[in-house]
């Protein structure tokens, strides 16, 4: 269902699609060393242990996520599987020299469904800023429309029947080394300097094709 490249059933920690210092000064190498190198790695390693010897061993991440969501009554492997998926999707949502305003069909759909890019920007930022505690904010595609959603902890739009297009991680470990408690500044920096609209556009095309 996702438009990103899926983490394989081997549950290998895939490196971000950029050098760990490539997003500076907007996201520091130190943040990536801890966030990707420690937190993301722990989700992958813990997932391997959880599914070893079970019927989930060897299954793709998306299968595990759907199988263990259990209508919100989460089964043990859900959090690590979803967090492993979410983080890979997050890294692929960014690029050096990113941000700014999208173009083409993506921009047209944002303007159609939110009345303007600026309204989308405000709604996405608000969702990310107001997610209480740990979680994520997303741009998603569902029923031929774009929508902004926020999810707690490890939950993602895959289990809500939507195609994720863009996400920002608002767990404190995502921004605390660079921004401390200034989550809104982190969100603004992400949107203006880091988002890969090319990745979002590619995911949109894949989502449209999958739902046709």
From Swiss-Prot:
<keyword id="KW-0472">Membrane</keyword>
<feature type="modified residue" description="N-acetylalanine">
    <location>
        <position position="2"/>
    </location>
</feature>
<feature type="binding site">
    <location>
        <position position="173"/>
    </location>
    <ligand>
        <name>Fe cation</name>
    </ligand>
</feature>
<dbReference type="GO" id="GO:0046686">
    <property type="term" value="P:response to cadmium ion"/>
</dbReference>
<dbReference type="GO" id="GO:0009570">
    <property type="term" value="C:chloroplast stroma"/>
</dbReference>
<keyword id="KW-0408">Iron</keyword>
<dbReference type="GO" id="GO:0009579">
    <property type="term" value="C:thylakoid"/>
</dbReference>
<comment type="function">
    <text>Destroys superoxide anion radicals which are normally produced within the cells and which are toxic to biological systems.</text>
</comment>
<dbReference type="GO" id="GO:0019904">
    <property type="term" value="F:protein domain specific binding"/>
</dbReference>
<dbReference type="GO" id="GO:0005737">
    <property type="term" value="C:cytoplasm"/>
</dbReference>
<keyword id="KW-0479">Metal-binding</keyword>
<dbReference type="GO" id="GO:0007623">
    <property type="term" value="P:circadian rhythm"/>
</dbReference>
<feature type="binding site">
    <location>
        <position position="35"/>
    </location>
    <ligand>
        <name>Fe cation</name>
    </ligand>
</feature>
<feature type="binding site">
    <location>
        <position position="87"/>
    </location>
    <ligand>
        <name>Fe cation</name>
    </ligand>
</feature>
<dbReference type="GO" id="GO:0009941">
    <property type="term" value="C:chloroplast envelope"/>
</dbReference>
<dbReference type="InterPro" id="IPR019832">
    <property type="entry name" value="Mn/Fe_SOD_C"/>
</dbReference>
<keyword id="KW-1003">Cell membrane</keyword>
<keyword id="KW-0150">Chloroplast</keyword>
<comment type="similarity">
    <text>Belongs to the iron/manganese superoxide dismutase family.</text>
</comment>
<dbReference type="InterPro" id="IPR036314">
    <property type="entry name" value="SOD_C_sf"/>
</dbReference>
<dbReference type="Pfam" id="PF02777">
    <property type="entry name" value="Sod_Fe_C"/>
</dbReference>
<dbReference type="GO" id="GO:0010193">
    <property type="term" value="P:response to ozone"/>
</dbReference>
<keyword id="KW-0560">Oxidoreductase</keyword>
<dbReference type="GO" id="GO:0005507">
    <property type="term" value="F:copper ion binding"/>
</dbReference>
<dbReference type="GO" id="GO:0005739">
    <property type="term" value="C:mitochondrion"/>
</dbReference>
<dbReference type="InterPro" id="IPR001189">
    <property type="entry name" value="Mn/Fe_SOD"/>
</dbReference>
<protein>
    <recommendedName>
        <fullName>Superoxide dismutase [Fe] 1, chloroplastic</fullName>
        <ecNumber>1.15.1.1</ecNumber>
    </recommendedName>
</protein>
<keyword id="KW-0934">Plastid</keyword>
<dbReference type="GO" id="GO:0009507">
    <property type="term" value="C:chloroplast"/>
</dbReference>
<comment type="subunit">
    <text>Homodimer. Interacts with cpn20/cpn21.</text>
</comment>
<dbReference type="GO" id="GO:0005829">
    <property type="term" value="C:cytosol"/>
</dbReference>
<keyword id="KW-0809">Transit peptide</keyword>
<keyword id="KW-0007">Acetylation</keyword>
<dbReference type="InterPro" id="IPR019833">
    <property type="entry name" value="Mn/Fe_SOD_BS"/>
</dbReference>
<dbReference type="GO" id="GO:0004784">
    <property type="term" value="F:superoxide dismutase activity"/>
</dbReference>
<dbReference type="InterPro" id="IPR036324">
    <property type="entry name" value="Mn/Fe_SOD_N_sf"/>
</dbReference>
<dbReference type="InterPro" id="IPR019831">
    <property type="entry name" value="Mn/Fe_SOD_N"/>
</dbReference>
<feature type="binding site">
    <location>
        <position position="169"/>
    </location>
    <ligand>
        <name>Fe cation</name>
    </ligand>
</feature>
<dbReference type="GO" id="GO:0009642">
    <property type="term" value="P:response to light intensity"/>
</dbReference>
<dbReference type="GO" id="GO:0005886">
    <property type="term" value="C:plasma membrane"/>
</dbReference>
<dbReference type="GO" id="GO:0046688">
    <property type="term" value="P:response to copper ion"/>
</dbReference>
<dbReference type="Pfam" id="PF00081">
    <property type="entry name" value="Sod_Fe_N"/>
</dbReference>
């Amino acid at each position: 269902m996702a438009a990103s490249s899926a983490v394989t059933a081997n549950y290998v920690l895939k490196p971000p699609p950029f050098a760990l210092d490539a997003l500076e000064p907007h996201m520091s190498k130190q943040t990536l060393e801890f966030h990707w190198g420690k937190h993301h790695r722990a989700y992958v390693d813990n997932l391997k242990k959880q599914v070893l010897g079970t019927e989930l061993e060897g299954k793709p991440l998306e299968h595990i996520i759907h199988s263990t969501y259990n209508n919100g009554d989460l089964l043990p492997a859900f959090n690590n599987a979803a967090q492993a998926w979410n983080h890979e999707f997050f890294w692929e949502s960014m690029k050096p020299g990113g941000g700014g305003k999208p173009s083409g069909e993506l921009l047209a759909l944002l303007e159609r469904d939110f009345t303007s890019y600026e309204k989308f920007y405000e709604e996405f930022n608000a969702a990310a800023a107001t997610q209480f505690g740990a979680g994520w904010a997303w741009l998603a595609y569902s029923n031929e429309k774009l929508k902004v959603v926020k999810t707690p902890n490890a939950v993602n739009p895959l289990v809500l029947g939507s195609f994720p297009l863009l996400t920002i991680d608002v767990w404190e470990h995502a921004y605390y080394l660079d921004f401390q408690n200034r989550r809104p500044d982190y969100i603004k920096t992400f949107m203006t300097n880091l988002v890969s609209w090319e990745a979002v556009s590619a995911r949109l095309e894949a989502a449209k094709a999958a739902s046709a």
